[in-house]
Amino acid sequence: QPSVFNLVKWLANLHKAPLKPDQKLAMLKRHIIPKLHYGLQTPNITGQILSEADRLIRKAVRRVLHLSVHTGSQFLYAAIRDGGLGIPQLRYHIPDVLRRRLENLSRDDSLAKAMLASAGPAAEFRQRVSVLAARGPPQAYWREQVATRPFSRGLEDCAHDAASREWLLRTPAGWTGRDFVRAAQLRTGNLPTMGLPYIPRERRRCRAGCERVESVSHILQACPVTHFERIKRHDEIVRKIAAHCRKRGWTTEVEPRIYHQDGQLFIPDLAVHLAAESILVCDVQVCWEGHRTLAKSWQNKKLVYDHPRFRKAAARRWAGSRIAISPLVLGPVGVWPRSNAETAALLQLPKTIKGSCIQSCLKWGSSIHKIFMASVWKHGPRPAHHHQPRPPEGQATANTGTLQSGRPALSHSRKKRKRQLTPTQRAPSLASPPAGATPRQLIEY
């Protein structure tokens, strides 16, 4: 009779092992789960046993990667190519293996075909396997779930380029266990926010004072508190692309200022002078994929510069050169879409550069969320208002005299007055209680 007794012991040993989270995940996928396959492929297998094994494995994965219990199953069970973590779901994987094995036997062996066709234990086993595998191939089901569920929509683009999923197969050099866990939390929508569905609707507003729901997309892409961190993320990707182009021997201009004859200014991110008097104008953008796909964002980004006014201004700047316009769009959860293929071919981007850009998106996404959480925890929830992005650290604004922390910059006279306050004025709670106060009033005081 198959059981999950050994699985419980193996998972307990896994949690005790002095391994990093990515090593524990690899151990689970490459050793522990495959060891279960032989013992579970028996005539006595039931859906209840397989479901219990899946429950234990889900619990182990969530513990290793610090995932919420509300994490969608599509993140766990979808293949890495389809945007998931590649954990096999035994409840449907084992019956599908048995179904395909019985089909091969009935097709290749006449005796096995006769046994499966006649009444008896073999036919009953085949019928039970057909019921267990009624859903069909599990990977096709989870691929559809990733593409249609709200928190995972857009991850299906991981199938178009290996750079989007390389970090899950081989941990990048220099990454710590914390980096891997935070990247996995970002990919699976587990970074803590107030915009999760189980939080009451009236409490979902951004704690930085925005009139928006505090979702991961808002924090990483729109919140003014993280404005300058988003600029740093963008600039790091631009620097990596520019360094690659210079290494190829191409003259590369970063943020060239291109003026139209009527004074309109255009500042694309890169202008790469390719061979044979050809110039590629490339603008980089990190876009969230929701109702608007990354392919649509790529088209919109191209239209920003691919119009007669810019081409006329570029012709004045680089007379006699052929101008090609091709943007570069990435997803903040580490997605390199298919639409970037044209730009990657023109710039001859290798897999290492693509992977490095993906790693920048993931690590900066983690840093942006961390800075947002530190800000709201330090200053507390702010009233709703339309505030400006916070200035760089230590820099006071010209019109309000406020520092990055949001507190007013004290003038010399205010500092002097603050030093002259008495202890009672500084901390009113330290003053003496009123005479004749009752014991309850003393406690409340």
Swiss-Prot record:
Residues 380-445 are annotated as: Disordered. Its EC number is 2.7.7.49. It is an enzyme of class 2 (transferase). Residues 1-114 form the Reverse transcriptase domain. GO terms for molecular function: endonuclease activity; RNA-directed DNA polymerase activity. It comes from the Eukaryota. Residues 380-389 have a biased composition (Basic residues). It catalyses: DNA(n) + a 2'-deoxyribonucleoside 5'-triphosphate = DNA(n+1) + diphosphate. The keyword Transmembrane does not apply. Coiled coil: none annotated. Residues 115-445 are annotated as: Nucleic acid-binding endonuclease. Keywords: Endonuclease, Hydrolase, Nuclease, Nucleotidyltransferase, RNA-directed DNA polymerase, Transferase, Transposable element. Residues 396-405 have a biased composition (Polar residues). This is Retrovirus-related Pol polyprotein from type-1 retrotransposable element R2.
